[in-house]
């Protein structure tokens, strides 16, 4: 192997290690709880954290269970959004939790980084509003009377604190060594796009006060959207993600569309550096599990249909008996009694 080839291989290895380590903190989702953390030494034992995240853990012990919850939210939402796709956001019990898929600069990695940073921002924000954290509470900057005439009151979600903590904790790996590399730029951009998906969908919730249900006085507060809405928004961004490449702009490096005919991406869009594999066949070297054995929809022409999901390999059909409740009746007072029925259904799985 030539010296140039050796150098290129070394760079690819460093790139893979860097990219994997950046998302290893998601392993916190595998823990049942980190709420029992009471000593700083425990932070050293949390699997998947880099040293600067360990230091943040020691300074913010009470927040770490919210970080764990945010990681769980991210994984669950990813699996929901991609449940009918060839890549269905499967996780492993090892590092990184999404396998080697996230070490590549693909659309899938872009979504994982975006939904993960959003998960932490969301969970920490909700913990603030619930009074679970001493360092933060409701957003007291929202007060007075709005231009629409209602009174700002109640507990507005402190999204500023949640976003700031997500930036400090999630972005720390990219903002250290190699922060100007193309993959670091991609990760940082998608992390921020995830947080903006919450910010742009913040809601105003209100309550009426008055005699007999009238609305003489209306008090309102700002609230984060349901996380499912954040997931839907980021899935749309995934479908319209922009392929980019690094380019020097002035004295710094930036990501620009690879195709000059495409419009420049915004801060809310997802970006990726390389095309995705087709995810059809198992390839453990690249972290692809394949679609063999996956359940498919025989009548669908979309990606969840047997033709596309099974990549043209065909599918098996089996008749399966399912047990379900039927003939339910309400009995006074107060319970519902049902019979157990068997139903025969057709199941289709990819060859």
From Swiss-Prot:
PROSITE patterns tied to this protein: WNT1
First and last residue of the signal peptide: 1-22
Job description of the protein: Ligand for members of the frizzled family of seven transmembrane receptors. Plays an important role in the embryonic development of the urogenital tract and the lung. Required for normal mesenchyme to epithelium transition during embryonic kidney development. Required for the formation of early epithelial renal vesicles during kidney development. Required for normal formation of the Mullerian duct in females, and normal levels of oocytes in the ovaries. Required for normal down-regulation of 3 beta-hydroxysteroid dehydrogenase in the ovary.
Family: Belongs to the Wnt family.
Gene3D superfamilies found in the cross-reference section: 3.30.2460.20
Glycosylation site residues: 88, 297
Cysteines engaged in disulfide bonds, as pairs: 78-89, 128-136, 138-155, 206-220, 208-215, 280-311, 296-306, 310-350, 326-341, 328-338, 333-334
Lipid attachment, kind O-palmitoleoyl serine: 212
Compartment(s): Secreted, Extracellular space, Extracellular matrix
Alphabetical keyword list: Developmental protein, Disulfide bond, Extracellular matrix, Glycoprotein, Lipoprotein, Secreted, Signal, Wnt signaling pathway
Origin organism lineage: Eukaryota, Metazoa, Chordata, Craniata, Vertebrata
Gene Ontology MF terms: cytokine activity; frizzled binding; receptor ligand activity; transcription corepressor activity
InterPro entries xrefs: Wnt, Wnt4, Wnt_C, Wnt_CS
Pfam families, sorted: wnt
Annotated source species: Rattus norvegicus
Primary site of residence: secreted
One GO-annotated biological process of the protein: negative regulation of cell differentiation
Gene Ontology CC: cell surface; cytoplasm; extracellular matrix; extracellular space
Subunit note: Interacts with PORCN. Interacts with PKD1.
Protein name: Protein Wnt-4
Post-translational modification as stated in the protein's UniProt record: Palmitoleoylation is required for efficient binding to frizzled receptors. Depalmitoleoylation leads to Wnt signaling pathway inhibition.
Gene for this chain: Wnt4
